């Protein structure tokens, strides 16, 4: 059960990290 909590925290941290980068640096290449 502990592993699930760790994975959740890790995913949240990664998500916040990418979110901060996206807001700090707008994507130069606007291609999907």
From Swiss-Prot:
Pfam families according to UniProt: PsbT
One Gene Ontology cellular component annotation held by this UniProt entry: plasma membrane-derived thylakoid membrane
UniProtKB keywords: Membrane, Photosynthesis, Photosystem II, Thylakoid, Transmembrane, Transmembrane helix
Signal peptide residues on this chain, from the entry's feature table: none
Biological process, per Gene Ontology: photosynthesis
TM region positions: 3-23
Predominant location category: membrane
SUPFAM superfamilies: Photosystem II reaction center protein T, PsbT (SSF161029)
Localization: Cellular thylakoid membrane
InterPro entries: PSII_PsbT (IPR001743), PSII_PsbT_sf (IPR037268)
Membrane topology reported for the UniProt record: Single-pass membrane protein
Keyword Glycosyltransferase assigned: no
Subunit structure: PSII is composed of 1 copy each of membrane proteins PsbA, PsbB, PsbC, PsbD, PsbE, PsbF, PsbH, PsbI, PsbJ, PsbK, PsbL, PsbM, PsbT, PsbX, PsbY, PsbZ, Psb30/Ycf12, peripheral proteins PsbO, CyanoQ (PsbQ), PsbU, PsbV and a large number of cofactors. It forms dimeric complexes.
HAMAP family linked: PSII_PsbT
Annotated function: Found at the monomer-monomer interface of the photosystem II (PS II) dimer, plays a role in assembly and dimerization of PSII. PSII is a light-driven water plastoquinone oxidoreductase, using light energy to abstract electrons from H(2)O, generating a proton gradient subsequently used for ATP formation.
Protein name, per record: Photosystem II reaction center protein T
Gene: psbT
């Amino acid at each position: 059960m502990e592993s699930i909590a760790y994975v959740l925290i890790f995913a949240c941290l990664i998500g916040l990290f990418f979110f901060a980068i996206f807001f700090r640096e707008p994507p130069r290449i606007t291609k999907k």
